Amino acid sequence: MFLVDSHCHLDGLDYQSLHKNVDDVLAKAAARDVKFCLAVATTLPGYRTMRELVGVRDNVVFSCGVHPLNQDEEYDVDDLRRLAAEEGVVAMGETGLDYFYTPETKPRQQESFRNHIRIGRELNKPVIVHTLSLIHISEPT
């Protein structure tokens, strides 16, 4: 048996004091029977950085998206579509709705979430959804 890390942020690890590099991280994971990783992006610049950092590997695939807490800057939807269509990208996201920390970006979060779902449908890719503080929401998004 082996394990799959279905949601890791390889671009957000401490490469100064905890890990030497991505090879080191993946070797440590493999030593604990984690043989495959889905590297999840939270911004489009972060996705690009992560792709460059990780490179092409047999044991890592990617998602491409904009996290709801990263809606302070606009992004190009066509850029999202183009990046999400790249080889090795198997999912959209991390996207979703998070009104707990940034309720002021609610309209932007909703529009972004719709864009991710729409592109996911176009590209036939699943969507990684982040939700927080949505239990009592009764309005449509």
Regions picked out by a protein language model, each given a short descriptive name:
Residues 1-138:
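Mid-domain alpha/beta scaffold segments of enzyme catalytic cores
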